[in-house]
């Protein structure tokens, strides 16, 4: 499964919202430094979809707020 994600780093609270177009808007506490926000994003998505962190990969947007995430079943 592939999903579009818009990430908002440095938020006060972690939050996952669904946009009208079906993509996810995810607020993260971590700053976008040294991959910390990406690590938190993968951990949060693994919990939401009940998969291991190794089943989630960032296909595009590694250094962008807009990302394409692939989740393997």
From Swiss-Prot:
Q: What is the similarity comment for this entry?
A: Belongs to the UPF0235 family.
Which species is this record about? Gloeothece citriformis (strain PCC 7424) (Cyanothece sp. (strain PCC 7424))
Instruction: Fetch the SUPFAM superfamilies from UniProt.
Output: YggU-like
Q: Which Pfam families match?
A: DUF167
Q: What is this protein called?
A: UPF0235 protein PCC7424_0673
Q: Which GO terms describe its cellular component?
A: cytoplasm
Q: InterPro entries from the entry?
A: DUF167, YggU-like_sf
């Amino acid at each position: 499964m592939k999903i579009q994600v818009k990430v908002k780093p440095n938020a006060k609270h972690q939050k996952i919202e669904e946009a009208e177009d079906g993509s996810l808007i995810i607020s993260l506490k971590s700053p976008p430094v040294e991959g910390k926000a990406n690590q938190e994003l993968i951990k949060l998505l693994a919990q939401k979809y009940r998969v291991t962190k190794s089943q989630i990969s960032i296909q595009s947007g590694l250094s962008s707020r807009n990302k394409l995430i692939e989740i393997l079943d």
